[in-house]
Amino acid sequence: MEQLISFFDRSKGKWISQRTTYKLSNKQMNSLQSSIIIKPDQSSSNSQLIASLRWGEISRQIIKNLNNQDFVNGNFKFHLRFTNQFNTKQVVTLCSITDKSLITFKTRYGSTTVDETYWFATDNLRLSTSIIKQCNFCVAVSFCSEIKI
């Protein structure tokens, strides 16, 4: 769990982001640049809350759930509660972390699965990939680079 908190601590700050997404169905590519400010969410008084961060209107929170934790071959897995302003319902995400520089999220929304991997190349360069599948068929992929300023 310390590795996850360390990853979130390293993510705090202002970032310039460049994301490129490729949709396989129509072979269309788009790129988006944005600025992200990641800061801790101190508005929660939940005693089960381990860590919480906000990316603008999006927040990710790690809630203690000792029944859903697994430690296998140095890979720590647990469930993450994910909420945002558009959907008040919490989504449970399987989160895996192997060291303080690499974290993966696997989220299911009905027949759609999103696999995300984030890692630090250096302290001020964070990279990520996302694979979106519908009915186990890949429909889109994306790559993102973020530079801390």
Curated annotation (Swiss-Prot):
Major place of residence: plastid
Origin organism lineage: Eukaryota, Rhodophyta, Bangiophyceae, Bangiales, Bangiaceae
Record-linked Gene3D superfamilies: 2.40.128.20
Molecular functions (GO terms): lyase activity
Gene name of the record: cpcS
CDD domains: CpcS
Keyword set, alphabetical order: Chloroplast, Lyase, Plastid
Domain of life from the UniProt record: Eukaryota
Keyword check for Cell membrane: no
HAMAP family linked to this entry: Chrphore_lyase_CpxS
Keyword field contains ATP-binding: no
Enzyme Commission number, as recorded: 4.-.-.-
Function: Might function to covalently attach a chromophore to Cys residue(s) of phycobiliproteins.
Organism of this sequence: Porphyra purpurea (Red seaweed)
This protein's GO CC annotations: chloroplast
Subcellular locations according to the entry: Plastid, Chloroplast
Protein name: Chromophore lyase CpcS/CpeS homolog
Similarity-based family: Belongs to the CpcS/CpeS biliprotein lyase family.
